[in-house]
Amino acid sequence: MAKLHDYYKDEVVKKLMTQFNYNSVMQVPRVEKITLNMGVGEAIADKKLLDNAAADLAAISGQKPLITKARKSVAGFKIRQGYPIGCKVTLRGERMWEFFERLITIAVPRIRDFRGLSAKSFDGRGNYSMGVREQIIFPEIDYDKVDRVRGLDITITTTAKSDEEGRALLAAFDFPFRK
């Protein structure tokens, strides 16, 4: 079991119970899933780019990504409905906790010119989204084998009812928010 999951059960639940005066342990917000999304717009011209992006995402997450397709045609971008234009992975359970731990302890500190993550990236329902400009911050990606530096979106979905609860949950994990 991931250390961060044990830490959540032992420490974070107690801390949030007292902070928000919950009556039941089930009211305490928890991390439900983490979604990684990589948009590869250049895949229209070269299908191999999408395969490389999917391989990178599989290495980062430890799970085979789902190829996302365009929902509608956009003439300005030369995209037709149904064209493969990206890939995504939804992590839950054990893999989610392991990825979350790697994200906080290893990947985020390796971001170039890192001064902390914005605390304003909550969506109003306690979910946090962040963008990463380079996939090479993850230790699973071999820098020499990267054909192109790509970014990805990371969304942390929680059961929190408000941004305040979501922020308190992530702060309890020592999430590196900007001061």
Curated annotation (Swiss-Prot):
One GO process term, biological-process aspect: translation
InterPro entries: Ribosomal_uL5, Ribosomal_uL5_bac-type, Ribosomal_uL5_C, Ribosomal_uL5_CS, Ribosomal_uL5_dom_sf, Ribosomal_uL5_N
GO molecular function: rRNA binding; structural constituent of ribosome; tRNA binding
GO cellular component annotations of the record: ribonucleoprotein complex; ribosome
Keywords noted in UniProt: Ribonucleoprotein, Ribosomal protein, RNA-binding, rRNA-binding, tRNA-binding
Keyword Ribosomal protein among UniProt keywords: yes
Keyword Ribonucleoprotein: yes
Top-level lineage group: Bacteria
Subunit note: Part of the 50S ribosomal subunit; part of the 5S rRNA/L5/L18/L25 subcomplex. Contacts the 5S rRNA and the P site tRNA. Forms a bridge to the 30S subunit in the 70S ribosome.
Similarity comment: family membership: Belongs to the universal ribosomal protein uL5 family.
Role: This is one of the proteins that bind and probably mediate the attachment of the 5S RNA into the large ribosomal subunit, where it forms part of the central protuberance. In the 70S ribosome it contacts protein S13 of the 30S subunit (bridge B1b), connecting the 2 subunits; this bridge is implicated in subunit movement. Contacts the P site tRNA; the 5S rRNA and some of its associated proteins might help stabilize positioning of ribosome-bound tRNAs.
Stated name of the protein: Large ribosomal subunit protein uL5
